[in-house]
Structures are given as structure tokens and as C-alpha cells.
């Protein structure tokens, strides 16, 4: 039996975390002993882990890092590692150099600095694994590279690497100690190799696995929108973070309110540190009823099913699981023309792309409202679309053992994967 370890930063309601759950389900096999270590020891999605996955955290908090309680818990973890274990002193040079570099760029990201402290302060795992996988960039990758014993090590990259704020100075050459790197899209691979061109031969694409049947089943369960609104419903799903550019979406909604021939209401499912700032902007523009921050929903799929249009207005992406979920449910999609999004949407075939500014978003939404037949065709083509390739999955299995093991395990899962 092969021992497989996954490490992830948190297990909150995020695209990478949900993609990990789908991967863990696809890996169910009597030939594998699967373990998971959550670096921060917190997150709401741990309750959805398959029963055959062994969670290694001695202490665990079922709260999101995006809530006040979760942020205090995370701060406590950082302080225990930084102060209790002396890492703030030992890593003072590293922290100051990177803080200065961030300040020079006008973009200070404390979370990127904390990942190194958390990774080095977390307990080292004593067991040796056949394959250890860092399923997210940052802390999980630092931990697997330096604190885990394994015959082989792999790391996943889910974002546009440099745009997200990562780079060589932060990473301390951690990828030199990784045997294989998987990126979730071709564009993410290209951007990662702009930072690390020397690792091209050990970097390949592994698309997020999407359980289409599960999404369609859950879309029929529970309730979605409960208000009595009878106009056009726009939906966006994602954390309230700067990357998602909700400020632009709010301004686009203000324009829609003035010029749309039909009532429009925009709903957002997600939580994050920007909530207060966004609520203030919504109040300032008088959009309290028109642009609604609804928080996290355990089952978001009835909302997808009930919306008229899915809009994904972001500054950059890796490969958006939210877009894939909207495609699985046959929704017309408007996304901003940026890395990640443009690889998922074929212009005027299964959706539309536009620049990231309020005027363009408003103009495209009005066009889609005015062309329902075209939008129905976009949704139908999106539903028929193959959402991912299994090539990356087969490559992943190959890291566990030789060709024979890869072929045996691939046969066990191929039917399930291709039916999604």
C-alpha cells in the first residue's frame, strides 16, 4: 500500500479546497493510504473529507480564516510559531527584505510573509511517505519542501504566480526540492515558468477535476434565492479579496441601475476581509438592494441554477472552479479577459470576455440581457464542454510508482472521471 500525503494551507470555502476534495474522492483506492495535513489547522470544509482520508492535525478549528474568530485563531498560530519558537528573530532578515520589496512595489501582503513562519513553526511529520503533495503555493509548498520526508514530492500552483505576489525571494528556492510541479492551466504554467524557467522539464498541467453529476444533483437540493425579485439575477461566487475586484463590479451595478431596461440584482456568495470596505461602497452608491453580499453558502449550486447570468470579474485567476461549476450547470457566463478566464471561455461560443472596467462590464451585461437566445446557446455549449483532461491525473499517479501501478490505478478511476 502506497502512502500519500496532501498538505494545504487551509480547508475553507475556496476553489482550491473544493478541487482537493474532488481529487481525494477520485483517488479512493485500496492501494492508497491517504493523509491530509492542514497547515493552519482550520477551515470549514474538513467535515466533507472522505472517511478514508486521515487528517493529521492534533488540534483543529472548524472556522474560516475569513471570519473574525478565524483570523484571531490564525494570528495565535503565527505568534506561537514566531514568538514561541523564536522564528520572528531567526527569520528577521528574511521578513525585512521581503517587507521592503513589497513596500517598493506598493503592495504589502502580510499573509505571504506569514506562510514561511507557519511552515517552519508547524510540527514536522515523522512518517515517511511515498508521495507528499503540496496542494497550494506558499505555506503548503514550503512545508512539504522542508519539513516532510518523502520518496517523491509534488506541488500544485493554482494562480498567476508573480501577480499573486510570490517570487524567488519569498520561496527560498523551495521548488528545487520538489520533484514535479503541477499547474491548473496552460497560462498558469507559462506565468510560473517566467519566474522559474529552469523547472520547465518538471512542470506540467493538471486540470481541476469537476464532479459534474454531484454539482447537478446538489443544484436540485435545498433552496436558492428566497427574495421576491422578478428581474435579471446576476451571480458571482468567490472570496471577498482584492483579486476578485468587487469594487469594479459594484460600480458596474451602479451604471446598470441607471440604464438597464429591466430590473437587475447582483448577488455575491463568498466571505472575506474586504466585506466592510465593500459594504461601505455599496451604501455610498445606494445599492443596498441591488448588490447583495450574501456570505458563504454550504451548497451554492441552487443559486447557480436560479441565476440568469454568471459574471466573473477578476484581475487574474489560475483556473476558476466557479466558472467550471457555472459551465456544468449550463449558465451563460461573462468574465473579464485575464489570465485563467480566457483559457476557460471561448469568446462568443460558450460565453463572453470583456475588459476589467465598469463601463465594459455594464455594456456586456446589457448586451447579454438584450440577446437571450445567444445566451441560451452559450449555456448549452458550456454544459456540453469537456471541463478537464485526465492526462494530468495519469501523470500524477505515475509519481506514485512505475507504469504498471499507474495503469492499474488509472483503470480504477478512469470510468468515474470520464463520466463527470
Indicate residue ranges for each PLM-predicted region.
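A conserved mid-protein helix/loop that constitutes part of the nucleotide-sugar donor-binding site
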Residues: 17-22, 232-255, 273-279
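Conserved acidic donor-binding segment of nucleotide-sugar-dependent glycosyltransferases
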Residues: 347-359, 367-372
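Acidic anion/phosphate-binding donor-loop and adjacent secondary structure
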Residues: 162-167, 193, 202-231
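A short, well-ordered alpha-helix in the C-terminal region of glycosyltransferases
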Residues: 283, 360, 367, 374-388, ...
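Short acidic/histidine- and often glycine-rich active-site loop of Leloir-type glycosyltransferases
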Residues: 325, 337-348, 352-353
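Aromatic "clamp/platform" in nucleotide-sugar-dependent glycosyltransferases that forms part
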Residues: 296, 315
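Nucleotide-activated donor-binding/catalytic signature segment of Leloir-type glycosyltransferases, i.e.
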Residues: 52-55, 279-295
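Short hydrophobic beta-strand element within catalytic cores of glycosyltransferases
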Residues: 332-335
